From Swiss-Prot:
GO terms for molecular function: U2 snRNA binding; U6 snRNA binding. Residues 110-121 have a biased composition (Basic residues). The gene is lsm4. This is LSM complex subunit lsm4. It comes from Schizosaccharomyces pombe (strain 972 / ATCC 24843). The lineage of its organism: Eukaryota, Fungi, Dikarya, Ascomycota, Taphrinomycotina. One of its GO terms (biological process) is P-body assembly. GO terms for cellular component: cytosol; Lsm1-7-Pat1 complex; Lsm2-8 complex; nucleolus; nucleus; P-body; spliceosomal complex; spliceosomal tri-snRNP complex. Its main location: nucleus. SMART domains: Sm. Gene3D superfamilies: 2.30.30.100. Component of LSm protein complexes, which are involved in RNA processing and may function in a chaperone-like manner. Component of the cytoplasmic LSM1-LSM7 complex which is involved in mRNA degradation by activating the decapping step. The LSM1-LSM7 complex loads onto the 3'-end of single stranded RNA. Component of the nuclear LSM2-LSM8 complex, which is involved in spliceosome assembly. The LSM2-LSM8 complex plays a role in the biogenesis of the spliceosomal U4/U6-U5 tri-snRNP complex by accelerating prp24-mediated annealing of U4/U6 di-snRNA.
């Protein structure tokens, strides 16, 4: 599973984010982008030593600072089911297309040289 797929499925749900500097943020995921930048709401920020807590209405976390993400187990199972279903649907779409190959496609014309860029003989 790709992390962005999981993050998109987690929007609106609780998430724990640990940064490289040791700070942790607990809140509800509001938004994420392709760089894994996150916007959280109703956030509790914990300092690395664990002795200071801050309550924030909203915060923005830059993706390159993220060390660890923890999401709910039900989100993991939900995304796994969706991806399995997509794989099944994808498999039946292209059945029977690999028989042609390259060449004259059943025409009976004699084998001719391509028309390329000149090179007449």
């Amino acid at each position: 599973m790709l992390p962005l797929t999981l993050l998109n499925a987690t929007q609106g749900r609780p998430i724990l984010v640990e940064l490289k500097n040791g700070e942790t943020f607990n809140g509800h995921l509001e938004n994420c982008d392709n760089y894994m930048n996150l916007t959280l709401r109703e956030v509790i920020r914990t300092m690395p030593d664990g002795d200071k807590f801050f309550r924030l209405p909203e915060c923005y976390i830059r993706g390159n600072n993220i060390k660890y993400l923890r999401i709910q187990d039900e989100v993991l199972s939900q995304v796994a089911k969706q991806q399995a279903q997509q794989r099944e649907n994808r498999g039946s779409r292209f059945r029977g297309r690999g028989q042609r190959g390259r060449g004259n496609y059943g025409h009976t014309a004699p084998n001719r040289r391509g028309r390329g860029r000149g090179g007449h003989m």
